[in-house]
Amino acid sequence: MADSSVNLSQGLLTFRDVTVDFSQEEWECLDSAQRALYIEVMLENYSNLVYVENYCICDTVCQHVKTEKESCNELGEMLHEPSNCALYNRSDTTEASNNYRCCKDQDASLDSSNPDRLKSTHTGKERCESKDCAKSSSLCSSIAQDQRTNSTNKEQRQEKYDDHFISTHSLMQQAIYIGENPHQCMKYGKCFSSASSLGVQQRTDTGNKPYKCNICDKSFTECSSLKEHRKTHQRLRAGTNPYKCNDCGKSFSYLSALQSHHKRHTGEKRYKCKECGKSYAYRTGLKRHQKIHTAEECYSCQYCGKVFHQLSHFKSHFTLHTGEKPYKCNECHRSFPHYVFFRRHKKNHSLQKSHKCKECGKSFFILSHLKTHYRIHTGEKPYKCTKCDKLFTQYSHLRRHQRIYTGKKLYRCEVCDKWFTLSSSLSRHQKIHTEAKTYKCKDCDIFFNHYSSLRRHQKVHTGERHYTCKQCGKSFTRGSTLRVHQRIHTGEKPYKCSECDKSFTQASQLRTHQRVHTGEKPYVCKECGKSLTTCAILRAHQKIHTGEKPYKCMECDRSYIQYSHLKRHQKVHTGEKHKIVNNVT
């Protein structure tokens, strides 16, 4: 026991060193469950610090816990029991954190078997020394007053607490030595050594996230995760992301985030499902997938067949097909289909655009967004399609492009049942049903739903063609049309039919061709009920009913419904038809 007194004088780790203090305002923000959890964790921290030969008289701690209990009546009598006191704060006798102290004997050990020493300790002769706050002084004064009036009763109760403390500590040490995990999860049967660890696991299972970030509203199951998350906001504001990707220049706050991001460039998928052999780049993706094989209850999307194991995820996914955007920003009235996107957007109103592009002057909230934007000026495209070798500035653009090959159309119009590969395409299409054609061409009086469509159309009248082919000198109004045209010179046909191996230069040509195999004819004439494979053929067919013949021969004034018919007719005047006949004969 002599060694114990020496260790005390040298200032061992005290409960104050590992405790977490709440201000009055913070304490009032916690609900009853969080307060109860706080007390439970503090009790557990203390029990891990305690040694049998080094503990303070328990009445001081009991009074402190009682004060905490009075500040939150909803906790009931859980802290008033002496059994809880035996596991709570011990000395707190370090010089720097002396909030309350009822013993100042540095030369003698605190031996509970010595009643005289215990008695002198609780006479109140030694005054409490408070260096932190008035609350601690008040607490010590109350303790000293209570000790003077009830010293005899406390001496008797102390013997009872000693016996309980020794037995409890022995059981605790025994559990540590034999590796016992007394706290069992009723759902999965997994055991934990502490109640706090069990609580974290239960919150993970139920999805309860009591720790919320006051900047972005993101929630966490553990306080430590919240603290780590707050550091990301500090780094974003300071613009300090030490880990940089060599391929695209994007920076990250953590090395693990950089390693995870690097898989996008390498295409590495190291996590493989043992059941079906499907591989994933991330462990979270594999875990999510494995629920398909193990889960009893699941929700399947009737449109795309995707399976979900949580109803909230299924409902969130379903808005992709319906185009519903329930989350609306009150400041700019912009709507979002998912709460995650909405929460990310709200940051734009609270932050300042401190990152400015030197080339065009455009400003951004986040440094990574500026770096992504800067690729427009440098021409850097780090993301490459493995099918057609096309390059992209952003990974999201690559994923969107890859849907061309998979034929996946996630977004469905509920009015006309038309499907789209992009959410933006669906939104643009839906305006056909909801909005009038307000944009009118001054030259030909044609109306359009979108201003961009009107501007594109006006180039027909102005003859504006900014995009010129270097091979043949042909010009085009759109860059995408030029890229498709250039495949004529290169012979590239990236879109291949899986049925007959026929290849095409455009995705639309492939889709039209595939209707030959499926027999699909989605375009129906309202006049005669005839079904046709393409919209262009339908428009040409409808001219039969209207009598419209817009294509006129300049030689003989004869008119035709289709331009191909006019070209065929013009060969009569040029003599091309006779030449072909003569060559055949």
From Swiss-Prot:
<feature type="zinc finger region" description="C2H2-type 12">
    <location>
        <begin position="495"/>
        <end position="517"/>
    </location>
</feature>
<feature type="region of interest" description="Required for nuclear localization">
    <location>
        <begin position="1"/>
        <end position="167"/>
    </location>
</feature>
<feature type="zinc finger region" description="C2H2-type 2">
    <location>
        <begin position="211"/>
        <end position="233"/>
    </location>
</feature>
<feature type="zinc finger region" description="C2H2-type 9">
    <location>
        <begin position="411"/>
        <end position="433"/>
    </location>
</feature>
<dbReference type="InterPro" id="IPR013087">
    <property type="entry name" value="Znf_C2H2_type"/>
</dbReference>
<feature type="zinc finger region" description="C2H2-type 6">
    <location>
        <begin position="327"/>
        <end position="349"/>
    </location>
</feature>
<protein>
    <recommendedName>
        <fullName>Zinc finger protein 54</fullName>
    </recommendedName>
</protein>
<dbReference type="InterPro" id="IPR001909">
    <property type="entry name" value="KRAB"/>
</dbReference>
<keyword id="KW-0677">Repeat</keyword>
<feature type="zinc finger region" description="C2H2-type 7">
    <location>
        <begin position="355"/>
        <end position="377"/>
    </location>
</feature>
<dbReference type="InterPro" id="IPR050331">
    <property type="entry name" value="Zinc_finger"/>
</dbReference>
<dbReference type="GO" id="GO:0005634">
    <property type="term" value="C:nucleus"/>
</dbReference>
<dbReference type="GO" id="GO:0003677">
    <property type="term" value="F:DNA binding"/>
</dbReference>
<keyword id="KW-0479">Metal-binding</keyword>
<dbReference type="InterPro" id="IPR036236">
    <property type="entry name" value="Znf_C2H2_sf"/>
</dbReference>
<keyword id="KW-0238">DNA-binding</keyword>
<comment type="function">
    <text>May be involved in transcriptional regulation.</text>
</comment>
<feature type="zinc finger region" description="C2H2-type 8; degenerate">
    <location>
        <begin position="383"/>
        <end position="405"/>
    </location>
</feature>
<feature type="zinc finger region" description="C2H2-type 14">
    <location>
        <begin position="551"/>
        <end position="573"/>
    </location>
</feature>
<keyword id="KW-0862">Zinc</keyword>
<dbReference type="InterPro" id="IPR036051">
    <property type="entry name" value="KRAB_dom_sf"/>
</dbReference>
<feature type="zinc finger region" description="C2H2-type 3">
    <location>
        <begin position="243"/>
        <end position="265"/>
    </location>
</feature>
<keyword id="KW-0863">Zinc-finger</keyword>
<dbReference type="GO" id="GO:0008270">
    <property type="term" value="F:zinc ion binding"/>
</dbReference>
<keyword id="KW-0804">Transcription</keyword>
<feature type="zinc finger region" description="C2H2-type 5">
    <location>
        <begin position="299"/>
        <end position="321"/>
    </location>
</feature>
<feature type="zinc finger region" description="C2H2-type 13">
    <location>
        <begin position="523"/>
        <end position="545"/>
    </location>
</feature>
<feature type="zinc finger region" description="C2H2-type 4">
    <location>
        <begin position="271"/>
        <end position="293"/>
    </location>
</feature>
<keyword id="KW-0805">Transcription regulation</keyword>
<dbReference type="Pfam" id="PF13912">
    <property type="entry name" value="zf-C2H2_6"/>
</dbReference>
<dbReference type="Pfam" id="PF01352">
    <property type="entry name" value="KRAB"/>
</dbReference>
<feature type="zinc finger region" description="C2H2-type 10">
    <location>
        <begin position="439"/>
        <end position="461"/>
    </location>
</feature>
<feature type="zinc finger region" description="C2H2-type 1; degenerate">
    <location>
        <begin position="183"/>
        <end position="205"/>
    </location>
</feature>
<keyword id="KW-0539">Nucleus</keyword>
<feature type="zinc finger region" description="C2H2-type 11">
    <location>
        <begin position="467"/>
        <end position="489"/>
    </location>
</feature>
<dbReference type="Pfam" id="PF00096">
    <property type="entry name" value="zf-C2H2"/>
</dbReference>
<dbReference type="GO" id="GO:0006355">
    <property type="term" value="P:regulation of DNA-templated transcription"/>
</dbReference>
<feature type="domain" description="KRAB">
    <location>
        <begin position="13"/>
        <end position="95"/>
    </location>
</feature>
<comment type="similarity">
    <text>Belongs to the krueppel C2H2-type zinc-finger protein family.</text>
</comment>
